[in-house]
Amino acid sequence: MTEYKKPIITEMRPKITVIGVGGGGGNAINNMIAENLQGVDFIAANTDAQALATSKAERRIQLGAAITEGLGAGSVPDIGNAAAQESIDEIMDHLGGTHMCFVTAGMGGGTGTGAAPVIAEAARRAGILTVAVVTKPFSFEGQRRMQTAELGVERLRESADTVIVIPNQNLFRIADAKTTFADAFMIADRVLYSGVSCITDLIVKEGLMNLDFADVKTVMKGMGRAMMGTGEATGENRAMLAAEAAIANPLLDEVSMRGAKGVLVSISGGMDMTLFEVDEAATRIREEVYDEADIVVGAIFDRSLDGTFRVSVVATGLDSNRSAQPTAPEAMNGQTAAAVPSRTLQ
């Protein structure tokens, strides 16, 4: 009689890497590390050796050491591009085994604008699902820097699977007279944190409805323009309020999720989260997009959220010609809707 042997099951989770390119990208991953984001690897890549030395990332790449001698790209994207080309083999060594890569950078300068598209293109060609999350300059930084940023964004849209843009100028929509300059940038960085965490949480955390990496890939691969949103609420009607907050878009440039081809909905709450609430939130998001959109919904438990309901949305494949904004919902009396500051972005 053949002896039955219990099969050995090896747990395999997708490897997700966030690479911060240039000064802006480096600051973004420093904030994510400080927030203790779990389930991802971090890489800092910069032409500026001094800035790189202050990075909190364990893995650091000096871009274009021979070209820049560690002195930066001097706000010249061509130098940033050449620096990334020089270091591309080292970059891909660090990305070995990665299934999904977030490339974050500030557009308008030299390193981020020039190097980020090179890195995104190489990662995508290697079969890595590649998502770029970048910022555009404030208006006071000048027209030339803005034009440089726009060219960088267009190059990224040719290189990455999905591109999300945060216009820094739109931070004025959610700032007040007491908002510090540092706080404003942390608001923008929080968007990246929310986007990455909502994806990793759906895959690795205990939940009512978990997703696998293939679900994420379906919504994000080759989808181009995208947006993210996160909302939180407590009290009565918290599911609907959180969904409405996730849909709201104070950081957008005349873009709506209405024309999205793919939508990833991440719903999280404490052990008091009900199936009815999950249905209510998911239904509200579904009402915001066209019927033909590919919608993937996941719901997870987070014991730290007892009493709080959170909804995160990633909408991809947005048609820029469909720019009509949905009407913002009116506030409801006696209820608390506390959306995280960096709720939504283009």
From Swiss-Prot:
Please name the PROSITE patterns in this protein's record: FTSZ_1 (PS01134), FTSZ_2 (PS01135)
Q: Which domain of life is it from?
A: Bacteria
A GO molecular-function term, please? GTPase activity
UniProt binding sites for GTP: 23-27, 110-112, 141, 145, 189
Compartments annotated for it: namely: Cytoplasm
- Whether Disulfide bond counts among this entry's keywords is no
Q: InterPro entries, from UniProt?
A: Cell_div_FtsZ (IPR000158), Cell_div_FtsZ_CS (IPR020805), FtsZ/CetZ (IPR045061), FtsZ_C (IPR024757), Tub_FtsZ_C (IPR008280), Tubulin/FtsZ-like_C (IPR037103), Tubulin/FtsZ_2-layer-sand-dom (IPR018316), Tubulin/FtsZ_GTPase_sf (IPR036525)
Q: Which GO terms describe its biological process?
A: division septum assembly; FtsZ-dependent cytokinesis; protein polymerization
Its name, as the record gives it, is Cell division protein FtsZ 2
Species annotation = Rhizobium meliloti (strain 1021)
Q: What is the lineage of its organism?
A: Bacteria, Pseudomonadati, Pseudomonadota, Alphaproteobacteria, Hyphomicrobiales
Gene this protein is translated from: ftsZ2
